[in-house]
């Protein structure tokens, strides 16, 4: 038995994480699976911790770039503050059939 996960970053490159959950001998398969889940959780935390550190270093190198990207969204949000949201379902209740 194996647990696997895949992360596709902004660059489009997939990163695979795999953990074997094989029960050895008389070991309970559920205990092996549980141990595999714990190992996978640790791998995921380590993997994303590394990505967060890399991202933080990128922001620390040029903090002005991080601030510049938000200006367009803020202006757009201000322009749309009085409009209704047309992306979701209608808030009106349907009329009951007579």
From Swiss-Prot:
GO cellular component, one term: cytosol
UniProt GO BP: tRNA threonylcarbamoyladenosine modification
Keywords: Acetylation, Nucleus
Residue span of region Disordered: 55-98
Chain positions found as N-acetylmethionine: 1
SUBUNIT field: Component of the EKC/KEOPS complex composed of at least GON7, TP53RK, TPRKB, OSGEP and LAGE3; the whole complex dimerizes.
Protein name: EKC/KEOPS complex subunit GON7
Organism per entry: Mus musculus
């Amino acid at each position: 038995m194996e647990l696997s996960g895949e992360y596709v970053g902004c660059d489009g490159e997939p990163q695979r994480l795999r953990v074997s959950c094989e029960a050895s001998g008389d070991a309970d398969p559920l205990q092996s699976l549980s141990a595999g889940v714990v190992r996978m959780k640790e791998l995921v935390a380590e993997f994303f911790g590394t990505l967060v550190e890399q991202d933080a270093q990128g922001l620390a190198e040029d903090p002005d770039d991080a601030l510049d990207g938000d200006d367009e969204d803020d202006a757009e949000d201000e322009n749309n503050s009085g409009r209704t949201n047309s992306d979701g379902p209608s808030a009106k209740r349907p009329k009951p059939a007579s």
